[in-house]
Amino acid sequence: MIILFVDFDYFFAQVEEVLNPQYKGKPLIVCVYSGRNEKSGAVATANYEARKLGVKAGMPISRAMELAPNAIFVPMHKEVYTEVSNRIMSIISSYSDKIEIASIDEAYIDITSKVKNFEEAIELGKKLKREIMEKEKITVTVGIAPNKVFAKIIADRVKPNGLGVVKPEEIEEFIKSIDIDEVPGVGNVISERLHSLGVNKLIDILSVSFDKLKEEIGEAKAFYLYRLATNSYFEPVLNKERVPHGRYLTLPKNTRDIKVIELYLKKAIDEAYNKIEGIPKRMTVVTIMQDLDIVSKSKTFKTGISKERAYTESIELLKQILQKDSRLVRRVGVRFDNIYKSKGLDVFFNS
């Protein structure tokens, strides 16, 4: 197998930097405020300038203010991050039909059938990074390895904006280099128990009896670590329903000319709808404005929507956006979700 893992670098904070270029290069902290006062709540994420000052995700905002009093503190804009994530996931999914979305800012794709060897995989990884940067102005880190776990570990080592590779002939030495705390799924409690057994490296697992390991951390976790240490972990990439069916296109120039925008919107619908295996019940028209702000409008259809009706309904949604927003449009796109698998005559009820 050749697995490619993608991690969006300091994602929430990076989106804020894209939308607010004046934040770039300054300590930036994205917060989840509790509402009691300006210091209550927790840090969601921070850019690398803030991390250098000791700020970490999950830290109380009050503590972050002590460590970085001159930092920029902003509230989370979850809908914006979700929209950007959906667009990036759409790009990633175009590189493989086997995609597993692990979180809002992480995904795995199986590229075994897309490349002949790891050299081609590296070139594909570079191409993916370039496309995401060109279209979304977001840097990502890519890890490539024979399994999902090693792909994530090597990516974590080369962040931010890196590309790390573990080739099959390098696996033996790579396994020896892995600290047990680097392994995904090994939290603080399990880490302490493993260290008490003398397990500091992943390879140290092999020096502990399986029964003892199972007694300390449970059979499932013991088996997981044993398989990693013996290079026998080959869990497949699992396709998840969260993969967005969307397409976004950049206009020739920023404009409010609805006829121009319509042409690109219809093209986006064609490309997105033709990839759907089933019938969508929800459609979202997305516009990215001249300042990279995102404005979207959605509509749900009880029995699903045909491509022909998607054309007409999308124009109505576009008109609603333009009526409420006076800015020029830079990009336009569409997203379909709530897909159901039924095929047949019911789609004509809404055509």
Swiss-Prot record:
PROSITE patterns: UMUC (PS50173). Mg(2+) binds at D7, D105. The record marks F12 as: Substrate discrimination. The gene is dbh. It catalyses: DNA(n) + a 2'-deoxyribonucleoside 5'-triphosphate = DNA(n+1) + diphosphate. Poorly processive, error-prone DNA polymerase involved in untargeted mutagenesis. Copies undamaged DNA at stalled replication forks, which arise in vivo from mismatched or misaligned primer ends. These misaligned primers can be extended by PolIV. Exhibits no 3'-5' exonuclease (proofreading) activity. May be involved in translesional synthesis. Residues 3-187 form the UmuC domain. Its cofactor is Mg(2+). Its EC number is 2.7.7.7. Keywords: DNA damage, DNA repair, DNA replication, DNA-binding, DNA-directed DNA polymerase, Magnesium, Metal-binding, Mutator protein, Nucleotidyltransferase, Transferase. Belongs to the DNA polymerase type-Y family. The keyword Plastid does not apply. It comes from Sulfurisphaera tokodaii (strain DSM 16993 / JCM 10545 / NBRC 100140 / 7) (Sulfolobus tokodaii). GO terms for cellular component: cytoplasm. HAMAP family: DNApol_IV. The keyword Nucleotide-binding does not apply. It comes from the Archaea. GO terms for biological process: DNA-templated DNA replication; error-prone translesion synthesis. This is DNA polymerase IV. The active site is at E106. Gene3D superfamilies: 3.30.70.270, 3.40.1170.60, 5' to 3' exonuclease, C-terminal subdomain, DNA polymerase, Y-family, little finger domain. Binds 2 magnesium ions per subunit. GO terms for molecular function: damaged DNA binding; DNA-directed DNA polymerase activity; magnesium ion binding.
